[in-house]
Amino acid sequence: DVENYPGFPSGIMGPELMSNFRAQAERFGAELLTKKVTRVNLHTSPFEVWVGDPSSNEPTFTAESIIVSTGAKALMLNLPKEIELVGHGISTCATCDGFFFKDQEIAVVGGGDSAVEEAMFLSRFASKVTIIHRRDQLRASKIMQDRAFANPKIKFLWNHQVTEYIGDTKLEGVKVQNVTHQTESVLNISGLFIAIGHTPNTSIFEGQLSLHENGYIKTESDSSRTNIDGVFACGDVQDFTYRQAITAAGSGCMAAIDAERWLEEQHAG
């Protein structure tokens, strides 16, 4: 479910929201193709885009302008039953799902700023938040660590990793292993938030678009412009701070306006 998108007071299923987006775009004449882009050439004009065989001599499409909105994937633990339990106790977004765990005991996996930020936010709702970290100290900034250590609702399980999910239709707990002594125990929780990072889908743009060290596309301040004139980026592929559906939609609007204005400039006169 998507519970924090404006206009849907009772929430809306993600696929339904996407279907609505698609129908609205098509009503205004957009052509949507479900295909995988395997190669791009942004060093030529018009830009070249390959779908299917990337070794083909001829590109599938050419374009005067391109908007990149390939998103980012949350890193997961890749344990059995994980996919089935996402949305049924397992989440990667505290701001999306935290409210549903009011007065419950939950856990966060990770040790960086993102994990601590998630835990701090979740402590507003949950009765207890356990940060599970495979090392004996956090990687988060000192100010974030100090805030977490001072929060009475946040506890820490050091030198542990999650090895198994307990529950079939909903999460009922996790099995954790001490990475030092190899001993195992069970943590009875109703929610697990995985905060071990995200991977932006930018591999086909490497060597062409300027990327941050973490792989996200660099854009100009207050703009969707990239380092290549005529190429714009929006959504989670360039935003590693907010990562919300509403901010992605807003930046998509920015990119559309930026691209439209750029095209008008190219054809002016």
Regions picked out by a protein language model, each given a short descriptive name:
Residues D1-P15, S141-A150:
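Conserved N-terminal glycine-rich FAD pyrophosphate-binding loop of Rossmann-like flavoproteins
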Residues Y5-L33:
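Conserved FAD-binding subdomain of flavin-dependent enzymes
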Residues R22-A63, R124-S221, I228, R261-G269:
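A Rossmann-like FAD-binding core segment of flavoenzymes
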Residues V68-S69, V108, I194-A195:
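Redox-cofactor binding/interface segments in oxidoreductases and associated redox assembly factors
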Residues K73, N78, I83-F100, N188, ...:
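FAD-site-proximal beta/loop scaffold in flavoenzymes
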Residues G110-G112:
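Glycine-rich Rossmann-fold phosphate-binding loop(s) that bind the pyrophosphate
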Residues A115-V116:
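N-terminal Rossmann-fold NAD(P) dinucleotide-binding loop
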Residues A119-M120:
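Generic hydrophobic/aromatic pocket-lining and core-packing "Φ" positions
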